[in-house]
């Protein structure tokens, strides 16, 4: 409707009057308030609390991350031999104990422990079928691969293959993780009458490798004192120019888990809870080394 002369209102005409807008101070957005608004509007993604690793087997494939004690750490877990090479062979009655099968089972248990502590873990030697096994006598096979690649029969080629795989992964991992370590797990074979313990070998060229081996040994020594006080621990630490220790780029340790041909050490291997204990202690050794960086 139109207004009258002098912008006056006319009688009998209905007018729509808009509401009065209240004047207030201009809205000022500071960096702090913007950040506050962003933080309250969008939650940060939570730390990964569960992982899936089919290599552990159907029952144990889902891994709950229960701690962040090894967050920021990356590991390369390598079980010895595998594929066409069973490694050392022990015997209990009619059963053959193949080194590669027992080393692999302990390696899987260690890898799972490390994942539970928040670490990134690469399992270098793999068997798509085995998983973590609670059998005393582990069935033997030649299925193992080096992360999917067939394992060569030639020893030097076999060792170089796993070092190449570790080094390729490490070149990328070292940009993301402040602590990268490799472990090579074996089961020593000596004459049947000689009982052995757990032995740790380090690179002669790396001070960090020696520190890691000593911290592993200290961990095992304290565990033996607690769980087997009457037996004592006679394992040692020594430097070795082993092929994998000289050619793997990340700091590494080489572990011999007893004597597969000795009846007492065989118990350490065939009893599943003992294999788990070895894996637990290896993990605690890594934890001690990580804290002492």
Regions found by a protein language model. Give the residues of each.
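Solvent-exposed, polar/charged alpha-helical surfaces in well-ordered, non-transmembrane soluble domains
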Residues: 10, 100-108, 112-116, 164, ...
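Structural recognition of the beta-strand scaffold that forms the well-ordered cores
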Residues: 74-78, 120-125, 180-185, 199-201, ...
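Short, well-structured alpha-helical segments in soluble
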Residues: 162-177
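Active-site-adjacent mobile loop/cap segments within catalytic or ligand-binding domains
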Residues: 173, 188-191, 200-203, 227-293
């Amino acid at each position: 409707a139109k207004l009258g002369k002098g912008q006056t209102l006319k009688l009998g005409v209905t007018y729509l009057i808009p509401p009065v807008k209240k004047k207030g101070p201009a809205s000022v957005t500071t960096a702090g308030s913007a950040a506050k608004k962003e933080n309250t509007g969008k939650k940060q993604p939570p730390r990964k609390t569960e992982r899936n690793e089919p290599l552990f087997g159907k029952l144990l494939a889902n891994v709950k991350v229960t701690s962040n004690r090894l967050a920021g750490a990356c590991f390369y877990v390598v079980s010895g031999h595998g594929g066409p090479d069973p490694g050392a062979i022990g015997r209990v009655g009619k059963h053959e104990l193949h080194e590669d099968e027992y080393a692999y089972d302990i390696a899987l248990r260690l890898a799972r422990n490390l994942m539970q502590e928040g670490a990134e873990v690469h399992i270098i030697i793999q068997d798509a079928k085995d998983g973590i096994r609670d059998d005393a006598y582990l069935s033997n096979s030649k299925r193992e691969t080096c992360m999917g690649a067939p394992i060569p029969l030639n020893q030097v080629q076999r060792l170089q293959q796993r070092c190449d795989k570790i080094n390729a992964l490490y070149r990328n991992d070292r940009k993301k993780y402040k602590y990268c370590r490799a472990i090579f797990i074996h089961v020593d074979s000596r004459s049947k009458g000689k009982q052995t313990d757990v032995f740790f070998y380090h690179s002669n060229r790396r001070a960090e490798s020696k520190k890691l081996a000593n911290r592993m040994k200290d961990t095992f020594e304290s565990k033996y004192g607690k769980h087997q006080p009457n037996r004592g621990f006679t394992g040692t630490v020594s430097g070795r120019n082993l092929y994998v220790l000289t050619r793997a780029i990340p700091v590494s340790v080489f572990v011999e888990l007893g004597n597969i041909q000795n009846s007492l050490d065989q118990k350490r291997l065939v009893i599943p809870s003992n294999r788990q204990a070895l894996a637990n202690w290896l993990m605690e050794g890594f934890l001690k080394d990580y804290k002492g960086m």
